[in-house]
Amino acid sequence: MLIDDTTMADASSELYEPVNQYKPVARNIGIVDGPFEYLTTAGVRLPLPFTTRMTVVRLGNGELFIHSPIAFDAALAKRLGAMGTVRHLVSPNQFHYAHIGEWSRAFPDAVTWASPRARKRAHSRGIDVRFDRDIGVEPPEEWRTEIDQIAVPGGIFGEMVFFHKESKTLILADTIINLELDKIRQPWRFAAKLTGMYYPRGQIFFGMRLPLFLQKRKTRAAVQKMLSWQPERIILSHGRWFDSNASETLQRTFGWAL
């Protein structure tokens, strides 16, 4: 069975609401917008809410690849279970892993994938999550024919970027942020305007900029690889995703590295 692609998610009207509902993006790939999360420092929750989003890819064998799982929701889990076998729970960077434990307890046969540094960070923060495998430079056998990947440098914010070949969709977590100013409150709104991380152009996450610049050669190689895939759209974890002109967006955002 293929994921239904008759009612596609609209990047403008369905970006946030409804939450915890699967929204097809293209054949065999969709998104789920999640509830607000809050930044925490030293165990203290800061009044800085941000939106969340996970991406779901249905592989040819019926298994589901879930990128950056949002907070667990039983009804959503049931819906996904009906679409395919929840098999791969993927952490794209060391900050997008917190809910993998919840999903793995609901789907104990799923394989949990750790991005670089995710194991250490989870342990240091006392997060209850079991990681089965580590994500390497090359895509593993489990999805290499359908999903490609590349490591994007960024210091502690570095992440694994994925590409769904069938739909020509680039899947990002934090590398690019594209916040809609009318959907966020202060001080996020001020920060977004100050750093350029807002719709319609978006921008590289500010925490990655200096590390990317200092590793310009690796950055160039990663961007050239992404451009070689000729992506048509870019799904982001935070803010409005780009439903068209993906290559142009990459060239505009990373032009300084090319």
Q: Over which residues does each language-model region extend?
A:
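Active-site neighborhood of phospho(di)ester-bond hydrolases with catalytic His/Asp-centered motifs
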Residues: 67-68, 87-93, 113-115, 171-174, ...
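Active-site HxH/HxHxD metal-binding segment of metal-dependent hydrolases
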Residues: 77-141
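Cap/insert and terminal regions of metallo-dependent hydrolase folds
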Residues: 39, 47, 71, 83, ...
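Metallo-beta-lactamase
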Residues: 24, 116-159, 165, 214, ...
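Active-site-proximal beta-strand elements of phosphoester/diester hydrolases
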Residues: 31-34, 66-68, 148-151, 170-173
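Conserved, surface-exposed functional patches that form binding/active-site neighborhoods
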Residues: 153-154, 160-201
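Short beta-strand scaffold segments in enzyme catalytic cores
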Residues: 54-58, 159-164
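Zn-dependent metallo-beta-lactamase
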Residues: 2-60
